[in-house]
């Protein structure tokens, strides 16, 4: 009976992908590591059945586009668009209030210096 239901619904096979990795102390640990992958698979499966395959492909393309946006080298990219698509903007973690660059003790690097270094315009020889 289960095989008939599975064939009719075309459910994705959900198996523990990290179970073969050595060094995990408990099976629950491997399940927790695979939770995000399994959740994405199920969400894509449901979206494919409701809206069609094009919707899953469209979301993957949007994720790729939003993950490419970068700021200048001295500023950290917040990736707001990517966080919104992935649903991470609804979570409130320690990093949201503990990793504020304005309260950091380390000074921000100079924009011109970091761009010259990135473009390879800095010379290792000193002028003096």
Curated annotation (Swiss-Prot):
Any single GO BP term: proteasome assembly
Subcellular location: Cytoplasm, Cytosol; Nucleus
GO cellular component: a single term: cytosol
Recorded superkingdom: Eukaryota
UniProt entry tagged with the keyword Transmembrane helix: no
Coiled-coil region(s): none
Keywords for the protein's UniProt record, in alphabetical order: Chaperone, Cytoplasm, Nucleus
Cytoplasm among keywords: yes
Family recorded in the similarity comment: Belongs to the POMP/UMP1 family.
Assembly and binders: Constituent of preproteasomes, but not of mature 20S proteasomes.
Function (record text): May function as molecular chaperone essential for the assembly of standard proteasomes and immunoproteasomes. Degraded after completion of proteasome maturation.
Protein's UniProt name: Proteasome maturation protein homolog
Source organism per UniProt: Dictyostelium discoideum (Social amoeba)
